[in-house]
Swiss-Prot record:
Job of this protein: Inner capsid protein that self-assembles to form an icosahedral capsid with a T=2 symmetry, which consists of 120 copies of VP2, with channels at each of its five-fold vertices. This capsid constitutes the innermost concentric layer of the viral mature particle.
Required cofactor(s): Mg(2+); Mn(2+)
GO terms of biological process kind: 7-methylguanosine mRNA capping
Organism: Reovirus type 2 (strain D5/Jones)
Biased composition (Basic residues): 1-12
Composition bias type Polar residues, residue spans: 55-66, 118-139
Enzyme Commission number(s): 3.6.4.13
Zinc finger feature spans (C2H2-type): 181-203
Family named by the database record: Belongs to the turreted BTV-fold inner capsid family.
Keyword field: ATP-binding, Capsid protein, Helicase, Hydrolase, Inner capsid protein, Metal-binding, mRNA capping, mRNA processing, Nucleotide-binding, T=2 icosahedral capsid protein, Virion, Zinc, Zinc-finger
Protein name listed in UniProt: Inner capsid protein lambda-1
Biased composition (Basic and acidic residues): 18-35, 80-98, 105-117
Subunit structure: Homodecamer; each decamer is made up of two conformers of VP2, called VP2A and VP2B. 12 homodecamers assemble to form an icosahedral capsid. Interacts with protein mu-NS; in viral inclusions.
Length: 1275
């Protein structure tokens, strides 16, 4: 009887008996049909199509004939001479000899087939005659009747036995070592072929006594179908820039913005138009009659107001404008944006919040001026007064209107007016370009100095911002080096250097800036898994895109299909493990999420979920529990759980309860306590740390398991990543360019990797398999297992032990490189603490962020829960997903490592915004320092900072008040830099009144590691402080008056301004006869017509008349009472009250001095609107300045300022020669120092005392290309 040809690799297929051998009835027709089906498209390598149809030798014949075919592969002993004279390692000779021997054995087997023909013949009549011998083909394996057609049964049997994958020649199950016979499964050496056959049978590689289990086949089918089209096995070929960029960066900050207009934030506004009689109309409007443009407004009164970028020409609007209306209008809204209840009066603001609102206004002022002055080119002026100066060419159709404002000295008229007199006194040659050629090396020079209208404060802010960007600038050579370092040389980066091209590429960031930004990210995570989990998912997707490793679960199914099991077995180990590894109801992205977790072991602890542990602790007698233990043992080393080793140990200890006992030193954490509960270092059993405490007699398996863990648990290592010299490093507890790994790292093969069984994870898997074999071999633990089940289990473990998966080698060689390549570009840089392996004393127990300096005693009363943030996120992973990936990894057949990574990595580095995260870190650092500085101005944080605004009223901000203020700072920074995601949000929770940022982690032994990043300095903070110092001198320009006000009747015909009152009208606490109305003062009304008496601050009863001083708070709390009692005395002039304000917004009401004016209506309305939580803008009545004689009428003033607060007045009667009546002011030459003083250096400024309105402005002609525009990458 002929044997149906089977695919073989020179050995048994591993499926036991050939079930079709019993079903073969000798029919030539059936043999032909089966041969045509079996051999279709299944051609063994090295054989012809004709040879495929020849009958094949028996299993033992082929084994003996090909015993030397793979000797060098099995013994790994190349170069030695075997017993037949062949050189080991010469695969050509050995394979040819094996093929010849196999062919001879086949011929001998074919000759013997005629002698083995059946003695019983069959005919078709037997089917209908029960008394005749029926055909054996109608009987199934159990002896029952089988009505399926023979062709169907043969096809089913063939598909169950024969692999659909091409066979490989030369993989026999055994090989001769020269000194014995070696098993290729466990490498054991036997002394005779019979001993070897018996040994091979123990692995489940039986000959004709067993057959492939239908249970295995069913589970293989279900296993393959369940994995079909699963995302983990789909390798995406799409590595386009856009999709990769979405994973690598969030918003691109708007760091570089340009302004081609005027560099000024202060605008001269006409307040009152010129009022002149008809007889001098032509004289006054001489310049208008001849269409001569004036550099300044021609008005009776003009003032300076804040209006950022009022003459700008920008490429992007930072949307942080500070626009102040003229003082004749109400500007109270600028001082009530923050910390003012919506129920307050529309016209009022809380005076205790003035300082916070002023600080916010100054921050907006600075943010709206973070522009670079753009170089726009020049043209020579042909007008006579500029002496051929080179004036800047402005873009836009309305450029002409700006020249008179930019260059006041271009005007020249014989008219007599304050404007013309000012122009005549100017230095004529300080106009236009200054001391710099326009062309440099054939291109526009990178910077140029220009004399033009600008204010010194805006020029200083933009100059500091430009200097900050210049410090961040990197040249193409540095870019080339940095990108090559980050890409580990897999991408060839070149940078052609062109000296004539001026580039500004601000990507250099310091370590301190990145560390501060990293701490903010860590605080953002806190203990919230929903924040970090998307980050890990994105990294896992990115790893899948660039990795050559492909997860192919058919490797597992094909391996299990070679396991031999008896048909009489009630349990199937191979079927059981296949069922365990199916992807139902599991997140099978856990494998690459676990790899991503390696980058963040300082804040994320990846653990194995409870469902992966044996149910209720499990039992060693359960096959299901044994596979749970196997899956768990393979997956645990890939997690970042520092307690993973003890969990692995206790998992088996749980299963051994009742069989083996180990000494446990904790009454709560006993041997029966679930292994997942051992999640902290104090729960580690002493016997696990000192395995000598485990008796090798009472607990031999657990002693062996503990020894395996201590010896074979993977060893941590590290790899270089990033370019900290250029891009900085966010590492906090590790060196700047070190990336830690929980397993050993070996250099990768730069060409084609080959299968390697010497890596740590493969050794670990082998030891786990050997341990399980010891378990199943011992009848003490498996008393109910039959020998067939034990053999099947051992065979399954041997298959898993030597499964041809590339994943362990990938994890040791390529995965670290992939992590190191993508780590420098991640929005969340790696945050790691050292991996400790089995060193319990070094296990990190706490990672926290502190906002307060511990060495400062005088701190606000803060709660530790709001100033210290403990971070840490446990992230549960499915052990089955990790184990599937470990057992089923493969590489593309044509893989060349360096070529693969060049193609995969290049699109990431070719993205134009790949390193925008560095700029974001710089902005985060700026925002943090700005917040700390500003909060220190309104609360006591002991942070060393100059407080220029202490004279402005403010309460001592609480945590909630400071948080509201911090929220506005955060919003302003995000708006200015065009950011939509989180910036300072982590600092808004808790208490933002911080003095420093520090992070620490503590080990189990009590040792604490603290990192306090040094604040590297913030240009935004410096600019805000500069603006505050200027505000301290030039507060009137910002709509704020300083000092107090005096309420009392003053009638006069003298045309003076209440913002600059005569000195004799002002009194203070030191003035004789002045009384102070304190908090404990009382009013005693007189009896029988006597005047009321008041007990003053000294306790004396004095009449309520004369000069008094009231604190503003006292007036606010008693506003209704005081208004009713004091208005009569104030109106009659018998009572004058000085209200101590400190600082206050004001509003001007101009009146015609020729008409009688009384300010009581303004005063009474203002008094009525005062409330305990708000005050309106203080109204002042000011006469209009006149350039001719007038008849002045009496004016009654009720509110005057105690200090000079008229610095915002620019000029009166600017189109006239002089002011005759009313306040008089000429164009302030002190604000045009370099234009009017020939001895002043051209670059001299007078900040912070005076804001100059004409300066030298440096303008730049830089290009700002992305990194990818100046380097050429070759994939």
């Amino acid at each position: 009887m002929k044997r149906i040809p089977r695919k073989t690799r020179g050995k048994s297929s591993g499926k036991g008996n050939d079930s079709t051998e019993r079903a073969d009835d000798g029919s030539a027709q059936l043999r032909d049909k089966q041969s045509s089906k079996v051999t279709q498209n299944v051609k063994e390598p090295g054989t012809t199509l004709k040879e495929q149809y020849k009958t094949r030798p028996s299993l033992q014949t082929v084994q003996k004939a090909t015993e030397n075919a793979e000797l060098p592969m099995q013994t790994n002993d190349e170069g030695a001479v075997d017993k037949k004279g062949n050189t080991k390692g010469d695969k050509t000779n050995e394979h040819v000899e094996a093929e010849v021997n196999a062919a001879d054995a086949t011929k001998r087997q074919a000759k013997d087939t005629d002698k083995q023909k059946a003695q019983v013949t069959y005919n078709d009549t037997g089917i209908n005659n029960a008394n005749e011998l029926s055909r054996s083909g109608n009987v199934d394996n159990e002896g029952g009747d089988n009505q399926k057609p023979m062709t169907t049964r043969i096809a089913e049997a063939t598909s169950a036995i024969i692999s659909k994958h091409p066979a490989r020649v030369g993989l026999p199950p055994t090989a001769s070592s020269g000194h014995g016979y070696q098993c290729h499964v466990c490498s054991a050496v036997l002394f005779s072929p019979l001993d070897l056959d018996a040994h091979v049978a123990s692995h489940g590689l039986h000959g004709n006594m067993t057959l492939t289990s239908s249970e295995i086949q069913r589970h293989i089918t279900e296993f393959i179908s369940s994995w079909q089209n699963h995302p983990i096995v789909q390798v995406s070929a799409d590595v386009e820039n856009k999709k990769t960029a979405q994973l690598l960066h969030a918003d691109t900050p708007r760091l570089v913005t340009w302004d081609a207009g005027l560099c000024t934030s202060f605008k001269i506004v006409p307040i009152v138009p010129a009022q002149v009689p008809q007889d001098v109309l032509a004289y006054t409007f001489f310049t208008s009659s001849y269409a001569i443009q004036s550099p300044f407004p021609e008005a009776a009164v003009s003032r300076i107001v804040v209006h950022t970028r009022w003459a700008s020409n920008v490429d992007f609007d930072r949307d942080s404008s500070v626009i102040m209306a003229p003082p004749t209008e109400n500007n109270i809204h600028l001082f009530k944006q923050l910390l003012n209840n919506e129920t307050l009066s529309v016209r009022g603001a809380n005076p205790l919040m003035f300082r916070a609102n002023v600080l916010h206004m100054l921050l907006e002022f600075v943010l709206d001026n973070l522009y670079i002055n753009k170089h726009t080119g020049f043209s020579q002026d042909h007008t006579p007064f500029t002496e051929g100066a080179n004036l800047r060419s402005l873009p836009g159709p309305d450029a002409e209107k700006w020249y008179a404002i930019m260059y006041p000295t271009r005007m020249g008229t014989p008219n007599v007016s304050k404007i013309c007199n000012f122009v005549a006194s100017c230095v004529r040659n300080r106009v236009g370009r200054f001391d710099r050629a326009q062309m440099m090396n054939g291109a526009m020079s990178e910077w140029v100095d220009v004399f033009e209208t600008s204010d010194a404060l805006t020029v200083s802010i933009r100059g500091r911002w430009m200097a900050r960007l210049a410090r961040m600038n990197i040249n193409p050579t540095e870019i080339e080096w940095a990108l090559t370092e980050c890409a580990h040389g897999y991408v060839t980066v070149t940078s052609p250097y062109a000296p004539s091209v001026n580039r500004l590429m601000p990507y250099r960031v310091s370590n301190a800036e990145r560390q501060i930004s990293q701490i903010i990210r860590i605080m953002n995570i806190g203990n919230n898994a929903t924040v970090i989990q998307p980050v890990l998912q994105d990294i896992s997707v990115l790893l899948q895109r660039i990795s050559p490793l492909q997860i192919d679960p058919t490797i597992i199914s094909n391996t299990m299909s070679t396991v031999s099991e008896s048909t009489t077995q009630t349990l199937s180990p191979a079927s059981s493990i296949l069922g365990k590894l199916r992807p139902s109801n599991s997140d099978f992205s856990s494998f690459r999420v676990a790899l991503a977790g390696w980058l963040y072991n300082g804040v994320v602890t990846t653990v194995i979920d409870d469902s992966s542990y044996p149910k209720d602790g499990g039992s060693v007698t359960s096959l299901e529990n044994l596979w749970d233990f196997f899956i768990l043992a393979l997956a645990l080393p890939l997690t970042t759980d520092p307690c993973a080793p003890v969990k692995a140990f206790m998992t088996l200890a749980n299963m051994m309860v009742g069989f083996e006992t180990i000494p446990m030193d904790n009454q709560i954490y006993t041997q029966s306590r679930r292994a997942s509960a051992f999640s902290t270092p104090h729960t580690w059993p002493r016997c696990f740390m000192n395995i000598q405490l485990i008796s090798p007699i009472d607990a031999p398996i657990l002693r062996q398991w503990a020894e395996i863990i201590h010896r074979y648990w993977p060893n941590p290592s590290q790899i270089r990543f990033g370019a900290p010299n250029v891009f900085g490093s966010a590492n906090l507890f590790t060196p700047p360019e070190v990336l830690l790994l929980p397993i050993d790292h070996q250099p990768a093969n730069v060409t084609t990797p080959t299968l390697d069984f010497t890596n740590e994870l493969t050794n670990w898997r082998a030891r786990v398999c050997e341990l399980m074999k010891n378990l199943v071999d011992n009848q003490r633990y498996q008393p109910g297992w039959t020998q067939s089940l034990v053999s099947s289990m051992r065979g399954t473990l041997d298959k898993l032990k030597l499964i041809k998966s590339m994943t362990p080698m990938y994890l040791q060689q390529l995965a670290p490189v992939e992590l190191a390549v993508i780590a420098p570009m991640l929005p969340f840089p790696p945050f790691q603490v050292p991996y400790v392996r089995l060193d319990r004393d070094r296990v990190p127990t706490m990672v926290g962020v502190t906002r307060q300096s511990r060495d400062t005693i005088t701190q606000p009363a803060l709660s530790l829960s709001t100033t210290n943030t403990t971070v840490g996120v446990p992230l549960a992973l499915d052990a089955r997903a990790i184990t599937v990936a470990l057992l089923s990894g493969k590489y593309p057949s044509d893989l060349v490592t360096n070529v693969w990574y060049a193609d995969a990595i290049y699109p990431m580095y070719a993205d134009t915004e790949v390193f925008s995260n560095l700029q974001r870190d710089m902005i985060t650092c700026e925002a943090v320092q700005t917040l700390i500085t500003l909060v220190a101005q309104i609360s006591e944080t002991q942070y060393p900072v100059d407080r220029y605004l202490d004279w402005i009223p403010s309460l001592r901000a609480s945590a909630a008040t400071a948080a509201t203020f911090a929220e506005w700072v955060n919003t302003s920074m995000k708006t200015a830099f065009d950011l939509s995601d989180m910036l300072l949000e982590p600092l808004l929770s808790g208490d933002p009144r911080m003095s420093q940022l520090a992070i620490q982690y503590q080990q189990y032994n009590g040792r604490t590691f603290n990192v306090i990043p040094e604040m590297p300095g913030s240009v935004v903070t410096d600019c805000v402080q500069l603006t505050a110092e200027v505000f301290n001198h030039e507060y009137n320009l910002f709509g704020i008056a300083r000092g107090d006000i005096i309420i009392g009747r003053v009638q006069s015909t003298h045309l003076w301004s209440p913002l600059a009152p005569p000195p004799d009208l002002v009194f203070d606490r030191d003035t004789p006869g002045v009384h102070v109305f304190g908090r404990d003062c009382r009013i005693s009304f007189g009896m029988n017509g006597a005047a009321p008496m008041i007990r003053d601050e000294t306790g004396m009863m004095v009449p309520f008349e004369g000069n008094w001083i009231f604190p503003l708070a006292l007036w606010q709390m008693n506003t209704r009472y005081f208004n009713q009692q004091f208005d009569a005395w104030i109106k009659t002039g018998e009572l004058r009250i000085r209200i101590e304000m400190g600082a206050y917004p004001y509003m001007l009401h101009y009146y015609d001095p020729r008409q009688y004016a009384n300010a009581w209506n303004l005063t009474s309305a203002w008094l009525e609107e005062i409330s305990p939580t708000s005050i309106p803008s203080v109204p002042f009545m000011v006469p209009i300045s006149s350039d001719h004689d007038i008849s002045s009428a009496p004016a009654v003033q009720y509110i005057i300022s105690t200090e000079y607060n008229d610095r915002s007045l620019f000029c009166t009667n600017s189109s006239s020669p002089q002011t005759i009546a009313g306040p008089d002011k000429h164009i302030p030459v002190e604000r045009y120092n370099i234009l009017t003083n020939p001895d002043a250096p051209p670059t001299q400024i007078q900040l912070p005392e005076v804001v100059d309105l004409y300066n030298v402005v440096t303008r730049y002609a830089y290009e700002t290309p992305p990194i990818t525009a100046v380097v050429m990458g070759v994939p």
